Amino acid sequence: MSNPGGRRNGPVKLRLTVLCAKNLVKKDFFRLPDPFAKVVVDGSGQCHSTDTVKNTLDPKWNQHYDLYIGKSDSVTISVWNHKKIHKKQGAGFLGCVRLLSNAINRLKDTGYQRLDLCKLGPNDNDTVRGQIVVSLQSRDRIGTGGQVVDCSRLFDNDLPDGWEERRTASGRIQYLNHITRTTQWERPTRPASEYSSPGRPLSCFVDENTPISGTNGATCGQSSDPRLAERRVRSQRHRNYMSRTHLHTPPDLPEGYEQRTTQQGQVYFLHTQTGVSTWHDPRVPRDLSNINCEELGPLPPGWEIRNTATGRVYFVDHNNRTTQFTDPRLSANLHLVLNRQNQLKDQQQQQVVSLCPDDTECLTVPRYKRDLVQKLKILRQELSQQQPQAGHCRIEVSREEIFEESYRQVMKMRPKDLWKRLMIKFRGEEGLDYGGVAREWLYLLSHEMLNPYYGLFQYSRDDIYTLQINPDSAVNPEHLSYFHFVGRIMGMAVFHGHYIDGGFTLPFYKQLLGKSITLDDMELVDPDLHNSLVWILENDITGVLDHTFCVEHNAYGEIIQHELKPNGKSIPVNEENKKEYVRLYVNWRFLRGIEAQFLALQKGFNEVIPQHLLKTFDEKELELIICGLGKIDVNDWKVNTRLKHCTPDSNIVKWFWKAVEFFDEERRARLLQFVTGSSRVPLQGFKALQGAAGPRLFTIHQIDACTNNLPKAHTCFNRIDIPPYESYEKLYEKLLTAIEETCGFAVE
């Protein structure tokens, strides 16, 4: 009988599984790499390569190889870009890990491990970023069925809810609790909400050696479809962003109040602590209830004014079948009314003689100041006077290279050429641009130029589709020219009455208007940081914080320290200087390394839209002007839809609206983009949709065509042609296929 121990001196058979890589470096501005992994047992001649995954920074391979490893052998796993490897020696290198014999023994039979990619040599100039996930198993321990592992869980979901893994400047791993706003060295095992630490800001950390970060495969056995997970995250981001782009969003109720409705549909407000209820909206000061109704402008769509038997005025909301005593126009414009009221009080204090004999008229905001639609109308009139009467701004691009080709053509033009009538053509397509092609061009282009993959912008938060300028955009040496281009495109969208599909943080629009940034602006962008800074201001931090006037910044995996003031690293934050610290921190947070980028973007925007034309708008209004309404009001859509060769009782019409109501916000936006060329709604609602020759309503057209055909859109006329499908299920299937799988223009 052979002795098993005698095999220790010979090669050992191990199975290496290369599962996936994450966050690879992006070296081309307009293209993503085609990564593949190469496995080499150094000096033995054993060499294997995975399949190539197209156009991604997060490739997933899940391929295994049986290797014979000697006692002193090492294994090198390298990642390469297949697009570049044929150009020259060493081209296309994206990073590698080298496993020496002691590391192989340590990693063997421990499940999947996440390893940081490194350079080939310490003197190499290649930029490397990202991680690779691998496992090493003894060959005699492998069963017949391999475990399916979801790669995304190895990176994103291996911590309990509410926790995040970060690294200090020295590289040590720390764990951030977003619920209690505390940090710790030990890896958490329970959700963040179960930890009861006193609320305090993040602490600084001392330098220590970085421990090896491992992820056991057994903990990741519950697989889920990464595409579904990605779609859920994307949909949540989309919903969060859309919830911000209403035309008039009433402010939140005061703390302790709830809005409720009686069985008869009457809206009232309950103070939960005292149990007292009232018909009056607590958000609206009672001294504003006597404002002249005519000065407030028209009621929102679907509302009506009525009187009770005693003559008291109330308001009927036919959209929700409710009634209330508070004027809905006051809730919508409350911040403007109060601002105007404060301005008038200041003026009255400075003037000996009152210029306004009627207090009621004084409290009323002038319509041109309050009514966004009216202000937008004035802006359009002023812009139309700048548009040349002759000539066109002609741009021809391909869908595949829309960003690069648009950039080259737009940047060659003079600013006044961008004011000419916009005429867009997609190469190889016969569509004539009466507005619809331009809307689609802006829709597609905004998706490309605002994509964080290109490095110009980054998401301000993980849970919402709002963008901010990437302080590390300088990895592209021409980045300032691209920001200049983005500003021009935003200006062109506003000038020609179109919209950008995407949005920035509200402080960005505030800066675009030339206004200063405050701590309050931080709340929407980074609520955790905002809470931490507020905590610092409101509490005695003596002996609690070990902050200095130096902050850390993660630049593509590298921790960079920034001093908020000269020699800030050696200046501790205390009770005396904490206000200065917060002020400098806020200023750094919004302007860190982006001054040049923002000025380039602002220059491009103001070349098309002079800044003095925007002085009557605030940042929320500017966002709506640039991006339009994100929230789609289905009732408004129905009311402002024209029917052609069909009636409201036609099955096609009823089934169409049934499908629309079943769609989530993202698919409704895609349907709107399919028919009109834009996923955004004008500020005035669907009644203001523009066609080839002015306003043109959304149109449902039932056509006599084969029911195997897909619905067809005419973006210049906001019309969708629908064959007479036999069932709702078939219409739903065909409509879904059309909005998600088709593109291109033609001439009939």
Swiss-Prot record:
Subcellular location(s) per record: Nucleus; Cytoplasm; Cell membrane; Membrane raft
Q: Which SUPFAM superfamilies match?
A: C2 domain (Calcium/lipid-binding domain, CaLB), Hect, E3 ligase catalytic domain, WW domain
The C2 domain is annotated at 1-119
Q: Name one GO biological process term.
A: protein ubiquitination
Asked if the Swiss-Prot or TrEMBL record annotates the protein with the keyword Membrane, the reply is yes
Q: Where is the WW domain?
A: 157-190, 251-284, 297-330
Active site at which residues? 716 (glycyl thioester intermediate)
Q: Which reaction does it catalyse?
A: S-ubiquitinyl-[E2 ubiquitin-conjugating enzyme]-L-cysteine + [acceptor protein]-L-lysine = [E2 ubiquitin-conjugating enzyme]-L-cysteine + N(6)-ubiquitinyl-[acceptor protein]-L-lysine
The observed outcome of changing residue 56 to A is: Increases auto-ubiquitination
Q: How is it modified after translation?
A: Auto-ubiquitinated and ubiquitinated in the presence of RNF11 and UBE2D1. Ubiquitinated by the SCF(FBXL15) complex and TTC3, leading to its degradation by the proteasome. 'Lys-48'-linked polyubiquitination mediated by TRAF4 at Lys-119 leads to SMURF2 proteasomal degradation.
Q: Which residue numbers delimit the HECT domain? A: 414-748
Q: What is its main location?
A: nucleus
Q: In which pathway does it act?
A: Protein modification; protein ubiquitination
Q: In the UniProt annotation, what is the result of changing residue 547 to A?
A: Partial loss of catalytic activity
GO MF terms here are:
identical protein binding; SMAD binding; ubiquitin protein ligase activity; ubiquitin-protein transferase activity
Q: Which UniProt keywords apply?
A: Cell membrane, Cytoplasm, Host-virus interaction, Isopeptide bond, Membrane, Nucleus, Repeat, Transferase, Ubl conjugation, Ubl conjugation pathway
Tell me which tissues or organs this protein is expressed in: Widely expressed.
Glycyl lysine isopeptide (Lys-Gly) (interchain with G-Cter in ubiquitin) crosslink residues: 119
Q: What is the effect of changing residue 716 to G?
A: Loss of activity. Loss of ability to ubiquitinate SMAD1 and SMAD2 and no down-regulation of SMAD1 and SMAD2 protein levels
This protein's source sits in the domain of life called Eukaryota
Q: Which PANTHER family match?
A: E3 UBIQUITIN-PROTEIN LIGASE SMURF2, HECT DOMAIN UBIQUITIN-PROTEIN LIGASE
Q: Show the domain comment.
A: The second and third WW domains are responsible for interaction with the PY-motif of R-SMAD (SMAD1, SMAD2 and SMAD3). The C2 domain is involved in autoinhibition of the catalytic activity by interacting with the HECT domain.
Q: What is this protein called?
A: E3 ubiquitin-protein ligase SMURF2
Organism expressing this protein natively = Homo sapiens
Q: Which gene encodes it?
A: SMURF2
